[in-house]
């Protein structure tokens, strides 16, 4: 039997004062049409990374709307996650030679997951599969029946994919009733996608990571980790991964420190069990920091959880997101929701989140350093930028909008 995740309870009514009236009304109308629909989400992990974080909000909100929603974790072990990490990087453009051995490992765990799903005897109206790890579950389960509609959700940028991996996976993905991408620019070239649907992700404004914290509370929490709250600090929150470029962030910090000598740098990362390369890059980042006492590295394994991330984001003088490649970069919306000035790379979904005056988009390390130095030297400019960024997120990147988009797709596929 597949492991089920209990995401707790959330009430859609709690968001009514935060979102637009029209959006709340449409959610009520869609909920009425889809009441009782059975939906199963399948992904690779229940912690670490943006997919799990989204599902911890999306699943209980859909339940509150009247749908019968479950969340299951596919079978996996270290050999499988090593393979899928290589697939993940390859789909984002990394060099990789697809081997018979890697295919066999990948197919074994997808087949085991599909078998458990089929043997459960449960019937589903919608099966919602997230990212490459479980992409073959539909094929190996036989589709579960004529009434089941299958959705494959890609949370990464596959616009310049390794063709071997894409050509291997795509015939299976093409069989899904819908392929959901964050934006058209992420889709792979040269493939047919009759079910293409564009749905950007979103953040939960009421989650522990995003709820309002007083400055005193945030300062107390941050100070417990040794960061001097009386001095400015730059922050990046991301996995320790070459695509997030923590080494480049350290280079930015070192350039800023030449102008603002008291500045500190905090790097916070979530270590997920399906990301074995993360540990290697953690140690690489530690070594690159070179023992600088003003550089701090933390993770969920050093007691930095959602509240602590909230505190760091709420208190940071500048939030950086120096991704080289990015699926969407929800941490940008998280920081903007806290009215923080953000300096971020012009990649992936980040430009969707940063509008004119609501953040600074950069392409190089010197540009990032200059932007950070400007924000540190002009607090009023930084405050106004943070205010504009927050309102853009309120209008476009909160979870009720994501739920609305998913429900629209369900209704279309089920013909209700």
From Swiss-Prot:
Activity regulation comment: Inhibited by 20 mM Fe(3+) and Mn(2+). Partially inhibited by Zn(2+) and Ni(2+). Activity is slightly enhanced by 2 mM Fe (3+), Mn (2+), Ca(2+) or Li(+) and by 20 mM Mg(2+), Ca(2+) or Li(+).
Cofactor dependency: Mg(2+)
Keyword annotations: Carbohydrate metabolism, Glucose metabolism, Glycosyltransferase, Magnesium, Transferase
GO process terms (BP): glucose metabolic process
Source domain of life: Bacteria
EC id: 2.4.1.245
InterPro entries: Glyco_trans_1, Trehalose_Metab_GTase, TreT_GT1
pH dependence, record text: Optimum pH is 8.0-10.0.
GO molecular function list: trehalose synthase activity
Alphabetized SUPFAM superfamilies for the sequence: UDP-Glycosyltransferase/glycogen phosphorylase
Assigned protein family: Belongs to the glycosyltransferase group 1 family. Glycosyltransferase 4 subfamily.
Record's subunit section: Homodimer.
Protein name stated in the entry: Trehalose synthase
Organism encoding this protein: Rubrobacter xylanophilus (strain DSM 9941 / JCM 11954 / NBRC 16129 / PRD-1)
Gene that this polypeptide is encoded by: treT
